[in-house]
Amino acid sequence: MHDQEAANGGETATNPISSLDVPTPPATTIPTLSSPAPLLRPAIPGARSAGARTPRLGLAIPPSPNVKPVGGAPGRPPLPTLHLATPMGSSVTPHEQPPGRPSIVTQQGQSASGGSESSAAHSRSGSFGPLDGRTSNPTSAGSQYSALSFASHFGIGSTRPQGTPDPASAVGSIYSERSDGGAGMDKDGNLKGLENFDKLTIDKARTADVEDLDVEGWKIASMEKRIVELGGLGEGAGGAVTRCKLTGGKTVFALKVITANPDPDVKKQIMRELDFNIQCASEHICRYYGAFEDPSTATISIAMEFCEGGSLDSIYKEVKRLGGRTGEKVLGKIAEGVLRGLTYLNSKKIIHRDIKPSNILLCRNGDVKLCDFGVSGDFGTKGEANTFIGTSYYMAPERITGQSYTITSDVWSTGVTLLEVAQHRFPFPADGTEMAPRAGLIDLLTYIVRQPIPKLKDEPSAQISWSENFKYFIECCLEKDPQRRASPWRMLEHPWMVDMKSKRVNMTRYLAQVWGWDDKGEAKPAE
């Protein structure tokens, strides 16, 4: 009974799905994948639907300032004087700016290197705004990395142009020439002017915590052994993750330690992960606290939010071990969080490119967050990318075949992830059989591209049944044609998603039952 409750987010039922009040639509009302768009609604009777009409574009084009008067009309008045607010905060126009560099004033608790929310909304290639999968900025640094990654994958040598800085220097202002008393490091790696951790504590009038530290602050905490490890959280791609806390601090955080690789492509990948984490500030994205480099051990450490509920991968495997099954309403809340996270990333012109169960984290209260942007990529002028990186098993067909792809490739990965959690097994091959032991990655990728997509099926022997809308949602995610596959924000309008958003699910109780937490938040002793 305990296992059945855990599988249904706190609902007691013999069938984890039967308690849902989700009416199954008639078979004739379920759309088919042969329709032009994989989703949604039929045309409204009587409405004007003669096809898409080209919108009229009204442009306000200012006339030339050199145009001559017509018919004796008076000449054009002189143009107004343009007064610019300079980036340094002065209201003086550029030609009136007094000589010398104005002083930079930083507020307490804010990094001089730009750790504010306003700076987090910008990338290396320009400012961002909500986009529909399209961009107008020049090719980004992520696209440059794509070429390097693709070349190295096929053994094509590439060298960095002379004078190009090493991406590892972007960890922070390590080499500094500041003369304002700030912290810096000389060319030999010796610290100059770094305040100690106790001085930071005095300045804050309290013990410094993770929100108070900038790049130099994290380096001080590391050098003075102020980072206390509380336990391991597992191994990620390229590094170990531990649960930590600062000495005297209250916030528990996850610290991902990555061993630096001399390969410049790997360094660029690590620095891209840091860059993306700095940009992102969303309730559906794992929060980033900071990073620092340890030259003595050749490692880069990344401090991020600790999500106590664990990864979706560990959760569904624990439910499977308990003999239960994750309910449809719980999967609905997880799908909603993932799609909202992807929609936010798209507004920042970011493709995650590594959606899988282990990169979807749950907080103690059930909030769903995306993490690990180690292979995320920002896309260029057409909103597309063409690199072959990421977790291959969850890749969309267009990525496997080396074609360009968009944010909809993450929708495919979301469908594979949900199908795996619902069925308690990786969904390929579709018939549920295991591939031959000697079958490798190429065989599996070939199968994904050429064979029919897997479908979510009922399991009468286990008394498991799924709604028709959920089955169709999975089909929409696993649409092989990337032109017909819906975007994350469109999938949020899917009938199943609309229905699931109206359901109330006690995700806190669900996680407590999965992990055996008691009312005090502690793990129950094993029986």
From Swiss-Prot:
Catalysed conversion reaction: L-seryl-[protein] + ATP = O-phospho-L-seryl-[protein] + ADP + H(+); L-threonyl-[protein] + ATP = O-phospho-L-threonyl-[protein] + ADP + H(+)
Disordered as annotated region, ranges: 1-143, 156-189
Enzyme kind, highest EC tier: transferase
Name by which UniProt lists this protein: Mitogen-activated protein kinase kinae MKK2
Keyword terms of this UniProt record: ATP-binding, Kinase, Nucleotide-binding, Transferase, Virulence
Originating gene: MKK2
Biased composition regions of type Low complexity, renumbered to the chain: 107-129
GO biological process: cell integrity MAPK cascade; MAPK cascade; positive regulation of appressorium formation; positive regulation of calcium-mediated signaling
One Gene Ontology term, aspect cellular component: division septum
MF terms in GO: ATP binding; MAP kinase activity; MAP kinase kinase activity
rRNA-binding found in the keyword field: no
Pfam families: Pkinase
Function according to Swiss-Prot or TrEMBL: Mitogen-activated protein kinase kinase; part of the MCK1-MKK2-MPS1 MAP kinase (MAPK) signal transduction cascade that is essential for appressorium formation, penetration and invasive growth. Beside its role in pathogenesis, the MPS1 cascade is active in conidiation and cellular stress responses. Targets downstream of the the MPS1-MAPK pathway include transcription factors MIG1 and SWI6, as well as GSK1 and MPG1.
InterPro entries in the cross-refs: Kinase-like_dom_sf (IPR011009), MAP_kinase_kinase (IPR050915), Prot_kinase_dom (IPR000719), Protein_kinase_ATP_BS (IPR017441), Ser/Thr_kinase_AS (IPR008271)
Family of the protein in this entry: Belongs to the protein kinase superfamily. STE Ser/Thr protein kinase family. MAP kinase kinase subfamily.
Top-level taxon of origin: Eukaryota
Cross-referenced SUPFAM superfamilies: Protein kinase-like (PK-like)
Residues involved in ATP binding: L233, G234, E235, G236, A237, G238, G239, A240, V241, K256
